[in-house]
C-alpha cells in the first residue's frame, strides 16, 4: 500500500551545453518540474515533468503542467491510498489530456512502489535486459558541424544516429551524411514539418537507406500518414501522433506507420507506455524509447522502460554529458561500448544529488495531506 503524505515540486532552470535546433524551435534553456513524493512510511520517489516552455511539441507547457498539478492532480493524489502505480492514472482519468503533468506525478509513485518491493524499476515494469543500446540525436546546424558531431558520437559508440530535418534541409543533407557515413544506422526526424503534397520530396529519401522517417506530417494527420507510408519504402515512425494506446491501435489498424516511438511523458506515464508496448508486441510493431532533453531522472526511467522485450531499436537514450555539464542524479547516465546498463538497484536506480539540484532550483511548492 502506498499513501502519499507529501509532494514537493522543484522548479528547475538548466542551460544546455549548446543550443539544440529542430525544424520548429531552438532550445538553450531547459525548464523542468521535478516531483518529489514521500509516502507515509517515509519512502521517497522522484518524477520529472518534461514539457517544454512553449507549446511547440505538444499543447502542454511547463506553465500548464504546473497549473494542472497544483490545482487538480496533486490534491487528488496526496492522502490517497494506492495498491499499484497503475491506479494513479485511473484516479486522474476524469481530467482530460495534460499527459506530461500526469506522467511526472505517476513516475514518482512508480519509484516508491519499486523501492518498497525491493526491486528495480525495470523489474517492476517487466524488463528483460541488463543493458540497452544507446542512440543520439543531432540537431540542425551547418553541415560541417553536423558531420563532426556525428563522427564524435560514432567514436563514442552510439549505435544509432538521428538527425533533424526540415524542408530545405533534407535530401541534400541526408545525401551528404550518407556519403560520409555509408553504413551508420541513420534516421531522420521531421517534427511534423511536411505536408502530403511533399510526397515526391520525401520519396527521394528512399535512396539513402534510412532506418525510418519520424513524424513527417502533422500529429493529427494519421490518415495522411497512411497514404504517405503506402508510397514510401522507408518506414514511417510516429511520435507526436501517438498519445495513447488507442492512438497506437488506430495507427496499426490503418497502416499509418511501421514503427512507434514511445515516450512515457508524451503518453501520460509508464502505465500507458506499457499498454502501448504490449499492443505493439501483439501486432509485431517495432518500438523504441524516445527522449525529451531530460535530466537523469527521466533518463533512468527511460532506460528501465527500454529494457522491455519489444524495444528492438536503439532509443534516444544518451549519456548525461550529451546535454548537461552536470546532471542532477548520481550516478549519471553513461554509455559503455554503445550500451547503457539497466540498474538493478531498487527503484529508479539513481539518487537525486540535492547539492547539485539546488544550483538550478528557482522555486519550490510543497503539498501535504493537511494543506
UniProtKB/Swiss-Prot annotation:
Cofactors, names only: a divalent metal cation
Its biological purpose: Converts 2-succinyl-6-hydroxy-2,4-cyclohexadiene-1-carboxylate (SHCHC) to 2-succinylbenzoate (OSB). Does not show detectable N-acylamino acid racemase (NAAAR) activity with N-acetyl-S-methionine as substrate.
Gene giving rise to this polypeptide: menC
Domain of life: Bacteria
Enzyme Commission code(s) on record: 4.2.1.113
Stored SMART domains: MR_MLE
Alphabetized GO MF terms: magnesium ion binding; O-succinylbenzoate synthase activity
Name of the protein in question: o-succinylbenzoate synthase
Amino acid at each position: 500500500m502506498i499513501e502519499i503524505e507529501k509532494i514537493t515540486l522543484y522548479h528547475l532552470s538548466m542551460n544546455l551545453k549548446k543550443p539544440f535546433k529542430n525544424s520548429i524551435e531552438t532550445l538553450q534553456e531547459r525548464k523542468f518540474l521535478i516531483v518529489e513524493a514521500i509516502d507515509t512510511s517515509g519512502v521517497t520517489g522522484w518524477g520529472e515533468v518534461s514539457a517544454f516552455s512553449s507549446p511547440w511539441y505538444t499543447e502542454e507547457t511547463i506553465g500548464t503542467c504546473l497549473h494542472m498539478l497544483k490545482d487538480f492532480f496533486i490534491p487528488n493524489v496526496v492522502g490517497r491510498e494506492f495498491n499499484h502505480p497503475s491506479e494513479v492514472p485511473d484516479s486522474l482519468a476524469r481530467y482530460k489530456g495534460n499527459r506530461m503533468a500526469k506522467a511526472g506525478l505517476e513516475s514518482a509513485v512508480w519509484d516508491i512502489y519499486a523501492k518498497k518491493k525491493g526491486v528495480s524499476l525495470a523489474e517492476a515494469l517487466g524488463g528483460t535486459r541488463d543493458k540497452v543500446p544507446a542512440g543520439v540525436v543531432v540537431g540542425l546546424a551547418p553541415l560541417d558541424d553536423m558531420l563532426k558531431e556525428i563522427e564524435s558520437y560514432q567514436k563514442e559508440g552510439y549505435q544509432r544516429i538521428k538527425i533533424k530535418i526540415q524542408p530545405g534541409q533534407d535530401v541534400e543533407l541526408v545525401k551528404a551524411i550518407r556519403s560520409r557515413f555509408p553504413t551508420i544506422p541513420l534516421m531522420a526526424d521531421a517534427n511534423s514539418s511536411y505536408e502530403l503534397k511533399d510526397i515526391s520530396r520525401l520519396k527521394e529519401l528512399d535512396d539513402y537507406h534510412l532506418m525510418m522517417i519520424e513524424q513527417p506530417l502533422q500529429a493529427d494527420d494519421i490518415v495522411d500518414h497512411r497514404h504517405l507510408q503506402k508510397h514510401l519504402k522507408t518506414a514511417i515512425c510516429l511520435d507526436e501522433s501517438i498519445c495513447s494506446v488507442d492512438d497506437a491501435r488506430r495507427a496499426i489498424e490503418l497502416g499509418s506507420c511501421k514503427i512507434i516511438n514511445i515516450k512515457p511523458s508524451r503518453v501520460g506515464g509508464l502505465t500507458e507506455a506499457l499498454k502501448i508496448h504490449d499492443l505493439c508486441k501483439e501486432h509485431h510493431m517495432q518500438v523504441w524509447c524516445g527522449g525529451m532533453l531530460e535530466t537523469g531522472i527521466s533518463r533512468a526511467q527511460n532506460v528501465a522502460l527500454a529494457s522491455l522485450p519489444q524495444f528492438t531499436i536503439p532509443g534516444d537514450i544518451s549519456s548525461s554529458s550529451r546535454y548537461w555539464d552536470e546532471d542532477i542524479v548520481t550516478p549519471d547516465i553513461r554509455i559503455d561500448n554503445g550500451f547503457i546498463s539497466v540498474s538493478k538497484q531498487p527503484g529508479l536506480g539513481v539518487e537525486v544529488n540535492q547539492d547539485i539540484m539546488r544550483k538550478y532550483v528557482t522555486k519550490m511548492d510543497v503539498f501535504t495531506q493537511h494543506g
